[in-house]
Amino acid sequence: MGRDTIAEIITSIRNADMDRKRVVRIASTNITENIVRILLREGFIENVRKHREKNKNFFVLTLRHRRNRKRPYRNIFNLKRISRPGLRIYSNYQRIPKILGGMGVVILSTSRGIMTDREARLEGIGGEILCYIW
């Protein structure tokens, strides 16, 4: 049975956010690199660093937290995996869902790479719906 790397990074980011940890380390693959790039561009994470340890590459993500006097409190954002290995979900560009009326982000895997719902609508292409972020 194969590993679902997208579900692993979503779960690790969600767990670190709920535990108010500022730094998360995830495995580096081409898919995770594209998803992390989208998260950084959309402002859900603060910083990304590439780290190499024992011939394995990792991404070190710095999550965005607001500072409080007593302790940092998290910006509430949710990630949800939609298409999974047992049940793939595809959509054409006209039927890509809008999360929170366009405030959230849908990440798609298209024939032109991994992109957000806004980019896919502008280019007029659909694809596999990987996850929702809001």
Swiss-Prot record:
Which InterPro entries does this one have?
Ribosomal_uS8, Ribosomal_uS8_CS, Ribosomal_uS8_sf
**Which biological process annotations from GO are given for this protein?**
translation
Supply the Gene3D superfamilies for this chain. 3.30.1370.30, 3.30.1490.10
A Pfam family of this chain:
Ribosomal_S8
Ribonucleoprotein in keyword set = yes
Keywords, alphabetical: Chloroplast, Plastid, Ribonucleoprotein, Ribosomal protein, RNA-binding, rRNA-binding
Give the UniProt subcellular location, in the record's own words. Plastid, Chloroplast
Q: Which GO terms describe its molecular function?
A: rRNA binding; structural constituent of ribosome
Q: Which PROSITE patterns match?
A: RIBOSOMAL_S8
**Quick one: where is this thing mainly located?**
plastid
- Keyword Protein biosynthesis found: no
Q: Name one GO cellular component term.
A: ribosome
Please give the family membership noted in the entry: Belongs to the universal ribosomal protein uS8 family.
The family database entries (HAMAP family) matched by this protein are listed as: Ribosomal_uS8_B
Which PANTHER family does this one have?
Answer: 40S RIBOSOMAL PROTEIN S15A (PTHR11758)
How it assembles, according to the record, is:
Part of the 30S ribosomal subunit.
Known role: One of the primary rRNA binding proteins, it binds directly to 16S rRNA central domain where it helps coordinate assembly of the platform of the 30S subunit.
Protein name per Swiss-Prot or TrEMBL: Small ribosomal subunit protein uS8c
Please name the source species.
Ipomoea purpurea (Common morning glory)
**Classification of source organism:** Eukaryota, Viridiplantae, Streptophyta, Embryophyta, Tracheophyta
Q: Which gene encodes it?
A: rps8
